[in-house]
Amino acid sequence: MGKIIGIDLGTTNSCVAVMDGDKARVIENAEGARTTPSIIAYTDNETLVGQPAKRQAITNPKNTLFAIKRLIGRRFESEEVQRDIKIMPFEITRADNGDAWVNVKGDKLAPPQISAEVLKKMKKTAEDFLGEAVTEAVITVPAYFNDAQRQATIDAGRIAGLDVKRIINEPTAAALAFGLGSTKENQVIAVYDLGGGTFDISIIEIDNFDGEQTFEVLATGGNTHLGGEDFDNRVIDYIIDEFKKEQGVDLRNDPMALQRVKEAAEKAKIELSSAQSTEVNLPYITADATGPKHLAINVTRAKLEALVEDLVASSIESLKTVLKDAGKSVNEINDIILVGGQTRMPLVQQKVAEFFGKEARKDVNPDEAVAIGAAVQGGVLKGDVKDVLLLDVTPLSLGIETMGGVMTVLIEKNTTIPTKKSQVFSTAEDNQSAVTIHVLQGERKQASANKSLGQFNLEGINPAPRGMPQIEVTFDIDANGVINVSAKDKNTGKEQQIRIQASSGLSDEEIEKMVRDAEANAEADKKFEELVQARNQADGIAHATRKQIEEAGDALNADDKAKIEAAIADLEKAAKGDDKAEIDAKTEALIKASEPLMQAAQAKAQAGEQPQQSAKDDGVVDAEFEEVKDNK
């Protein structure tokens, strides 16, 4: 059996790691980088992922997709998606099932299908490093992801050809990376994870007892729609508004200009982590009747901080809530771990330090810790990492809708998983023959204000006065945080159960179709790569043969020369087409036609050696040499 790899599937960047001996190792991608931009571009003949996709984003804005994690498992009508529609250069559309999908070149693509392209890149990166096929992975998700978002992430893994052995929360993974092998007893850490699109805060207790380490999540919270992308968007809005004031042109209507501004805003934000000011300079950003327009705006660190201070403040509010849920005070936190690229911002570091009254650790790489932790969990599942126990929690309360539109909670938020809980309910009317079990996730008392995870019916209840039948409802949450719900009539023994697959999720048939499409695309990609190699080989042989014709000169007779040149012309014509077999055949034909050229070259070389040899012999005196030994 092969290795279980750890993948941090990020909003902005993704990272892959694997256990190498007793340590987790981050794997460099084909471009030599340790992280890969979570960007996918669809061109006329191929799908680009990572840096190659990012490089062409400006010229292909409508078909270059980024921050897809913000859409995964979300309904089209949701407030977060409607907010994104206004600022994304690509088209977000409503799927038949009500999900937020993306329209690319007339095709509707599901977020798990798009995210699978990034996972395939991570899989290939690991396979190139390990020299063997990889089929199993641990994939991380924000701790505050709901059931639909977790299911969608597992679906993305399946489409990419990966058996997702475990979904692990990002802050928990970071804690594993930080605490593995530590000999300290009973330390409580806070993991503040502000990534590209999501924010999590988890309070985790790491306990060492008799050689075994236990990582227990005490409480978790956050916001699955707050991250570096939102910080970028504040800068983008500022730049666009300033340009509109100066030039009277709104760049939001120009996708190509918007993409250029997005890149510049992200770059400016990063630069302002180390500089006090930076200039955003974009010549020829647009044009109108008066001619081309140039954008030049100075952005200071103070201005950036003013633009985003409410976002940072909202993350600090979450800190207060989670500490309270964990039953801990600020003074009981031993260490603070910062995870996610956005935590490099000085304002974020300052506000977190002010809240806890101490500086965060500087020895944890915010871009790599999550993938490393996922690889460690892969090692635990594989049996390569011993004496480590991970106890995670469910981030949101789970329950069912009961009479009066109330949510009755069966499993409280921050309950350690896996877990199972049952409760007995009854009918609301006399002689009721069926009940509908409506499964909910959230913290509101009003059922309609929570996230609906799905519903099912239990039928065949014997007629009886209201309140008499006993219906036992059981919630079962596995280690991935995925939920199974069953309802059983204790009188008749009839039972109905469902694995919660959100009504907005992909069906098994859709996933299988996407898996088949991915496999077909992989075959098409392989054929395209082989065609390119054949073209390159043909070009190289044609060029080398031409050079040899020149060098052979008169040693090559005219008929042979004409045949070789005709073969070169045939090969170059074939190389412009898409038929690899034709290119290979014409390559072989040129090699065969070039045989007289080899003979001519050899004859010319031999003819050149003869006079040189005799010239060398003229006036050469044979000498005898005596070996002198140095005895010093």
From Swiss-Prot:
Chain intervals for the UniProt region annotation (Disordered): 601-632
Entries under Gene3D superfamilies matching the protein: 1.20.1270.10, 3.30.420.40, Actin, Chain A, domain 4 (3.90.640.10), Substrate Binding Domain Of DNAk, Chain A, domain 1 (2.60.34.10)
InterPro entries documented for this protein: ATPase_NBD, Chaperone_DnaK, Heat_shock_70_CS, HSP70_C_sf, HSP70_peptide-bd_sf, Hsp_70_fam
Induction remark: By stress conditions e.g. heat shock.
MF annotations from Gene Ontology: ATP binding; ATP-dependent protein folding chaperone; unfolded protein binding
Keyword entries, A-Z: ATP-binding, Chaperone, Nucleotide-binding, Phosphoprotein, Stress response
UniProt keyword Nucleotidyltransferase present: no
Composition skew (Low complexity), residue ranges: 601-613
Signal peptide: none
Domain of life per record: Bacteria
Residues the record lists as Phosphothreonine modifications: 198
Cysteines engaged in disulfide bonds, as pairs: none
Keyword Phosphoprotein included in the entry's annotation: yes
HAMAP family, alphabetized: DnaK (MF_00332)
Name of this protein: Chaperone protein DnaK
Species, as recorded: Actinobacillus pleuropneumoniae serotype 7 (strain AP76)
